């Protein structure tokens, strides 16, 4: 197994880890109630998905 030959500096460690972050979820507005919702998921406020009522709210 590979072993580091030298200690990695705090700056280099943080610089490498700066790219390792969570992506912000994309929000779209609901076609029926105009509330923000996640893509490809039923609207939590009105219960519609793809112009159909799928949840009882």
From Swiss-Prot:
Record-stated family: Belongs to the bacterial ribosomal protein bL32 family.
Domain of life of the source: Bacteria
SUPFAM superfamilies assigned: Zn-binding ribosomal proteins
Name this polypeptide is given: Large ribosomal subunit protein bL32
Keyword Ribonucleoprotein: yes
Gene that this sequence comes from: rpmF
Organism of this sequence: Streptomyces griseus subsp. griseus (strain JCM 4626 / CBS 651.72 / NBRC 13350 / KCC S-0626 / ISP 5235)
Molecular function GO labels: structural constituent of ribosome
One GO biological process term: translation
